[in-house]
């Protein structure tokens, strides 16, 4: 894998040499706009690197980057504009922004690491110490679990909870056999093991097939 830093995104000879190697490429885009990103991608691809082997990282080249300058949604703009894998190179303080980037779909996270934030140099204060790095990785792994498959359906625990959380049509009062079900003698209560309240209109006006006690589940 070759990592192209933000400062080299306009270095045509360098981009050509990397492209000719036909390896996986991670391209950082700090200080650049969409046109500069397009030019860099065109050079890499024309030189021989497959588009599917390129990941473009949104980045704010500022140490530390202020939250209001991060513009994390630009990562999605890059993804949608170039139909390419994206990630995020972070220079903000803390671990919140990389976690948010992972939630938005970043496939790569770059974060600087330091043993001492007080060391000389521009990026130590925006870097993570060992404990923070471990916390960030745990959080991102949790986010990966949370993303799911995108299909809206009840989870297995939710399926088990349906019976006690949802509701059924029940007798509001004692109901005698032959009595007509109406809004004055039926109600909606837990548990959800009887007739769904979504069938309310089809129950109203029907005759009771037997006697029902107050709060008993209605059966047709």
Label every PLM stretch briefly:
Residues 1-220:
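Catalytic cores and adjacent flexible loops of soluble metabolic enzymes
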């Amino acid at each position: 894998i070759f990592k192209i830093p933000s400062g080299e995104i306009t270095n045509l000879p360098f981009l050509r040499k990397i492209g000719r190697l036909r390896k996986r490429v991670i391209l950082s885009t700090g200080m650049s706009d969409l046109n500069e990103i397009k030019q860099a991608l065109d050079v890499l691809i024309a030189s021989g690197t497959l588009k599917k082997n390129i990941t473009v990282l949104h980045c704010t080249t500022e140490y530390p980057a202020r939250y209001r300058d991060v513009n994390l949604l630009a990562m999605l703009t890059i993804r949608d504009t170039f139909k390419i894998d994206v990630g995020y190179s972070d220079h903000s303080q803390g671990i919140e922004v990389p976690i948010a980037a992972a939630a938005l779909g970043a496939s790569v996270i770059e974060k600087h690491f330091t043993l001492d934030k007080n060391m000389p140099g521009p990026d130590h204060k925006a870097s993570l110490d060992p404990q923070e790095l471990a916390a960030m990785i745990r959080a991102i792994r949790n986010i990966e679990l949370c993303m799911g498959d995108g299909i809206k359906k009840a989870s297995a625990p939710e399926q088990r909870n349906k019976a006690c959380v949802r509701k059924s049509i029940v007798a509001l009062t004692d109901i005698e056999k032959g009595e007509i079900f109406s809004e004055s003698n039926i109600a909606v209560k837990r548990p959800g093991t009887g007739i769904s309240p979504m069938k309310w209109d089809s129950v109203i006006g029907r005759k009771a097939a037997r006697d029902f006690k107050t709060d008993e589940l209605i059966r047709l």
